[in-house]
């Protein structure tokens, strides 16, 4: 199959799954911003999503996108290293034309995945997962946290904020390269559009990750009872 046997096909899969995940990350940042304005409204959104079939279907699609993106990232990295052979040891420093994020996308991606797992443990495992256990597995008596309770509980921990800020920084680097690279891989980039996509990438990543950072800081202040 072209998508698996061709290096171009594998890059297309990486690009499409990456763009899909970028949209989800953007939605997630905007949804969290609701909690900055009204915790009651945020609770209502969490209750609306919950463990209903459409929320579970969306979760399954997102999980599939993440898995595909990770698998193809390792696949392409191994393929590229085999193609370069010993040449990769010949150069000790990064060429001036190669961005730092570009050269470290796999490492950044691994760090982001570890950060994502922590986030899932702090929120999904305490909100949606218990609902699934109760609604579909008949395991009653499981503690189900609301959105506000989960936020305040997570950010009351002194280590949460610094880890999240480092995670958002890694995500920023990953997105600044990933967005324009994705459009380049699907053939929507040329000498005119490439600088534009790079500009869009920088702005998009800065706005989304900046919003995440502001949310984390405000949630920490709220959890400490300062407001």
Question: Where do the PLM segments sit?
Answer:
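Membrane-embedded alpha-helical bundles that constitute the cytochrome b-like, heme-associated redox core
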Residues: 1-227
